[in-house]
Amino acid sequence: MAKMKIHELAKELGVDNNVIVNFLQSKGSEVKSYRNNIEEKEIDLVRGKFKGSVSSNEPKSIDNGKASRVEKPEKNNSVTAKADQTPSEPVVHKQRPMTAQGERKNMSEQNVTTGSTESEDNIQSVGDRKYQHTDRRPQGNNGEGPQTSTNSGDRRPQGQGSYGDRRPQGQNSGDRRPYNGDRPQGQNSGDRRPYNGDRPQGQNSGDRRPYNGDRPQGQGNYGDRRPQGQNSGDRRPYNGDRPQGQGNYGDRRPQGQGSYGDRRPNSGDRPQGQGNYGDRRPQGQGSYGDRRPQGQGSYGDRPQGQGSYGDRPQGQGSYGDRRPQGQGSYGDRRPQGQGSYGDRPQGQGSYGDRRPQGQGSYGDRPQGQGNYGDRRPGGQGSYGDRRPQGQGSYGDRPQGQGNFGDRRPQGQGGYGGRPQGQGSYGGRPQGQGGYAGRSQGQGSFGGFNKDFDKDKDSGYTRSFDKKRTDPKSGEKSSIKSDLANELTKEQRAAAFNDKSRDRDRNRDRGRNNVEDGNIKSAKGKKDPNRKGAFIMPKPQQSLEKQDEIKTVIIPEVLTIKELADKMKVVPSVVVKKLFLAGKMVSINSEITFEEAEEIALGYEIIAEKEVLVNKVEELLKEDDEDENLMVKRPPVVCVMGHVDHGKTSLLDAIREANVTSREAGGITQHIGAYTVEVNGEKITFLDTPGHEAFTSMRMRGAKSTDIAILVVAADDGVMPQTVEAISHAKAAGVQIIVAINKIDKPSANIERVKQELTEHELIAEDWGGDTIFVPVSAHTKEGIDQLLEMIILTAEMGELKANPDRMARGIVIEAELDKGRGTVATILVQKGTLHVGDNIVIGSTYGKVRAMMDDKGRRVKEATPSTPVEILGLNAVPNAGEIFMATENEKEARNIADAFISQGKERLLADTKAKLSLDGLFSQIQAGNIKELNLIVKADVQGSVEAVKQSLVKLSNEEVAVRIIHGGVGAINESDVMLASTSNAIIIGFNVRPDNMAREIAEREKVDLRLYRVIYSAIEDVEAAMKGMLDPTFEEKVMGHAEVRQVFKASGLGTIAGSYVLDGKIVRGCSARITREGTQIFEGALASLKRFKDDVKEVNTGYECGLVFEKFNDIQEYDLVELYMMVEVPR
């Protein structure tokens, strides 16, 4: 056996090329790709390995053959017996290369003269790899034989067809020249020159010239098996009768459109656009040659769809006319998937020409028109000659029309060749192959490729002496083309000339194809998609030429140098540009984002404002909890209200403890956290201060709780801090329960309290609202049980849940620095469980939990959700109200703390920058007369530090600004005193004492050190200190009025005004204003006051006196004198 290409063997066996290549390589063969030839020994080795996969579907194919045979065997009985023989004896074709060069030569004579099975056998043998009727595909082919008789030439998994392509939807036969002997059920032979014998049940022969016999049921012909009426495989339709659009040989569409050649209702009656031989359209219109949307056309030319062979209802095409709306033809295939002799995935291509645009023909046709021979741009044509009008005759073609063998180099396939996987006579992978496969799809039935198919990779090149040579294998075969015999010398010459013209046309088109980036190359070069092909990199010029839009991210304020660096330009260029625009700047000048954006646009750069990501928020962000892991937790209740309204006393009554007696001044100055058990249910209470100084504490309390109890005294009613507490609770989205306290007092008025709270949208339930009001008395413990029941009921309605099996997370209620224990933080666990030994981070502080104590001071090992505990082990005092998190390890805690610290530094730096701006500096210079009171605040707990700082800062006014230069937790120490001495500050200690060393230094350095236990006192003293710093203010005080009665002149004294005191009294050293007839003529000091000749200190009303004014002597009688003094006004 001769050599064979791997891909041909792969098609035969129905396996992937690479599988065989890999198999051979594993056996030590030197094959490199599926295009390599392999020896007979290797072929047998591969067949032995993969033969099982080929024969696996045989029964199915046989069944198909039989099934299609049983339908209606009553017509065309002349050849029934012979047709029945063929499928009943399936020929399993072992694939072998082209043998018996003379077999095909005499095939047509045998076909014409005899209808014997010998002819059938002849076709089968010729069909070895090149001319087989059936393409073997795993999808259940409807070939004549069983499925094992694979077509050695065409093997495409996608069912790209060739003459011998079989597809699940009705494949055709693989032989080009069908022996149209008797076939059951419309199987067509693949021979071009059909023996148009009778066929039962409308089977079509494969002959080009239609035998217009009747066909019932329109079953498809030779190679076409489609469920809905497939076509036969011969170009000339056997235009038998077909109902319901079953197609024939060439048309392969599931909807049964189109038949081989002529589709007319008269051709054999076909209702509703059933096609025939050549037309492949989804609607079934179309014809052999030209397909127009209206489907006119003819064997020659037919206007308006009138048929020649038979009439066509509107829209069925004819043999000759084909239009470019994607209708396929024998030759015309479009990307819309129209089928062809060999149907292909893109549907383009034809028997001969396959182009990406879907043109194609038996020979060559531009723009998708196709006919048997030459196809013209208009797509019209007839069986033989297709002209724009579609006239033509069967044989004669003037004007260079193509013939059976005219093929173009532009990747058009011949009988077989197709680029991109279209099938061929003996189909080749990726479209190679003509008669025996041509690379790049050139190939023809017997194309006159003497001058044009010179590509060394061409397949069997058909020349004028009708010999073909395979340059790869060296085999030669001289198979005479029956159709070529029919052509006269003149016709060949005309076709040859026409090919020359078309070649030029196609060259241009091919050039366009390359420019458009199409896969197919202009000269029919090798398929660029083949394995191992060199892929030319695409030019990147267009990308390079595009101006890339740059984007820079800039902050709110930046210097010109920073902007220039971000834009990657020289700073001096930016300065120069601004200078030319009239702006005097330097590279260190600061500009706003808007100005920077304008500058950047001048350089075609888009500026985007920098969005500061809050690292802290990102770190504190947490995922949603799984509902299945949630368990019920105790409610956290916050007691809020105005100072002295009885919040702590109410808690005492609930806890049956006495807390108030321990609070300085009887008012609460810390947040107290307690756990109370009521009827087996735990409730966590937070007691917040009611004094106005503790606003932030109340806010923290509201944020960390589920229910807020608003305590309002029945005798006092709604007070300022009550309103503030309502605001905090609403802002935190907390359910409010109003406890009206002190109802045991005689002056208690519950209804007035309800009315006042209505103004703040708290309406009692008995007034039609939804707020729970509970009258209680902390003193007599009246209403306490009812209040607790309401708390538990509200908590149940809220369905309070938390996941205890996770890392702990919560809020810091209070923090302090204990002399013996170090930093102590009171925290409320909100999620998870906190254990002793856990690493935690609170803002910028972190540490390991060394010990935990509950609200009663007992050591505990763990704290579950809604449990308040005190923890030890932090490296610094955290700020109250911050969130704490337990972490996996200390390193993670340290990283989070560092993020907090760095963010705090950035914020401080930004504040400092803002303060040091020129505008700020100028305003400070202007306000140089403002005095500052520097304070250092030390307190026992962090919450108190905040409260004192906020209260004192509020005291600032236009003349004296209170400045807290340091605030901290713990006792007053040496460093605090030194800082106060340096900055001339007053130290305020709240519930703390100075140590001995600090006290000595304070006395030595004369540092004012004030200690307080009640916040009221601290505020009052600071107010007094501020007043002492204020500049004194004076106002005018009128002493009395006098009238000048007589004027005296005295040497050495000047003019003396003898005056009478009208009211008040005149005192020495006062000032005077003199008015004459309503006009003030003098204002100045009184130089001398005498009564008669004696100097006196004062003169009362009704007495006379002498007045001398400084540097004023122009006094006249009856002038009015007003005397006043400037008196200091206390502040």
Swiss-Prot record:
Renumbered residue ranges of the record's region G3: 687-690
Alphabetized Pfam families for the sequence: EF-G_D2, GTP_EFTU, IF-2, IF2_N
Molecular function per GO: GTP binding; GTPase activity; translation initiation factor activity
Composition skew (Gly residues), residue ranges: 411-436
Compositionally skewed regions (Polar residues) per UniProt: 76-88, 108-125, 139-152
Region (G5): 777-779
Compartments reported by the entry: Cytoplasm
Keywords: Cytoplasm, GTP-binding, Initiation factor, Nucleotide-binding, Protein biosynthesis
Transmembrane segments: none
G1: annotated span: 641-648
G2, as annotated region: 666-670
UniProt record similarity statement: Belongs to the TRAFAC class translation factor GTPase superfamily. Classic translation factor GTPase family. IF-2 subfamily.
Function: One of the essential components for the initiation of protein synthesis. Protects formylmethionyl-tRNA from spontaneous hydrolysis and promotes its binding to the 30S ribosomal subunits. Also involved in the hydrolysis of GTP during the formation of the 70S ribosomal complex.
NCBIfam families the UniProt entry points to: IF-2, small_GTP
Protein name: Translation initiation factor IF-2
Organism ancestry: Bacteria, Bacillati, Bacillota, Clostridia, Lachnospirales
